[in-house]
Design a protein with these regions (language model features):
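Positively charged n-region of N-terminal signal peptides that target proteins for export
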Residues: 1-4
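A beta-rich soluble binding module of mature secreted/lumenal proteins
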Residues: 7, 16-193
Length: 193
């Protein structure tokens, strides 16, 4: 139930934020995403802090797989402060089939998937040519993630991504790095990397 509520909050907030773009420049997604290259496991390198990931202290990953109905299955996992892993399953549908770079995601149960407000924008706004990293955002600029195929990213690449994101209207000052390779001991976080 908690996962449903957190997923519902994300989708509702993203839906509301898409109406509140204000004077931001129009956000553009990348010209093309090859879905079979995008599938698989991604490590969260950094993000805008958000309510539905508040319990996560590190080791955050997102795994995408193709479903028979053409949609994508999402599995987001993270380490919590108590040392347990939290997992949230979701689904994505392609919103722009010409580019595959604009998706709609939901973590709400399937039986309410007919409601438009349970689906949130998930746009690939930056992508390495070799698919070693991807940057996710949405038109309201309320959500932002940097994902990579490896748990660490060199600082030069990270800074270049932040500069490009800033030119798109995102705020680098809001971005927080996500620790990978961490453990928890008695409620504290120990970074092993």
């Amino acid at each position: 139930m908690k996962q449903f509520f957190l997923g519902f909050l994300f989708v509702a907030a993203a839906a509301v934020s898409s109406f509140a773009q204000g004077s931001q420049p129009k956000l553009e997604a990348v010209p093309k995403v090859e879905l079979d290259r995008y599938l698989g496991k991604w490590y969260e390198i950094a993000k805008y802090p958000n309510k539905f990931q508040k319990q996560c202290v590190g080791n955050t990953t997102a795994t995408y797989s193709q479903k028979q109905n053409g949609r994508l299955e999402l599995l987001n996992e993270c380490l919590k402060k108590d040392g347990t892993m939290e997992a949230a399953k979701g689904e994505a549908k392609i919103a722009d089939k010409q580019t595959n770079s604009k998706l709609k995601v939901r973590f709400a149960p399937g039986f309410i998937s007919f409601l438009p407000f349970v689906w949130a924008n998930y746009w690939v706004i930056d992508l390495a040519p070799d698919y070693s990293y991807a940057v996710i955002g949405e038109p309201g600029r309320d959500y932002f993630w940097i994902l990579a195929r490896e748990p660490e990213m060199d600082d030069a690449t990270y800074q270049q991504i932040l500069r490009r994101a800033e030119s798109m209207g995102f705020s680098p000052g809001r971005v927080e790095k996500t620790p990978q390779g961490v453990e928890t001991i008695r409620g504290g976080v120990l970074n092993r990397t």
